[in-house]
Design a protein with these regions (language model features):
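Extreme N-terminal starter segment of soluble prokaryotic enzymes
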Residues: 1-4
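Core catalytic region of metal-dependent phosphoesterases/phosphodiesterases
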Residues: 6, 12-105
Length: 106
């Protein structure tokens, strides 16, 4: 398992394109990219936002994110919760998960 971290994407995931994030070539869904705050991918439900979320889902790795101060919390609250590695998450897509506050993951 490999773990990569970034933050403050604010809905712009261009830094995750293969040309910029070259390490992703050999990754699998068992490898994680953690976005530490200000994910911005769940903001207004727009078509372009949905396209970016689908694009993230199509990556070879799993995207995890922690909410920051620039999130649409009303929209985030509309997603169902499930348990993942012992803590609660909100699956935005099967491989794009919001790591909820106050949780501990194994």
């Amino acid at each position: 398992m490999a773990i990569f971290m970034t933050g403050d994407t604010h809905g712009d995931f261009s830094r995750l394109r293969p040309a910029a994030f070259r390490e992703q070539g050999g990754l699998t869904k068992d490898d994680y990219l953690i976005i530490c705050g200000d994910f911005g991918g769940v903001w207004d439900g727009s078509e372009i936002e949905q396209q970016w979320l689908d694009w993230l889902e199509d990556r070879s790795f799993t995207t995890l994110f922690v909410s920051g101060n620039h999130e649409n919390y009303d929209l985030l609250r509309s997603y169902p919760t499930s348990v993942w590695h012992g803590g609660h998450v909100q699956p935005i897509r099967p491989s794009v998960l919001h790591l909820m506050r106050g949780q501990l993951y194994e």
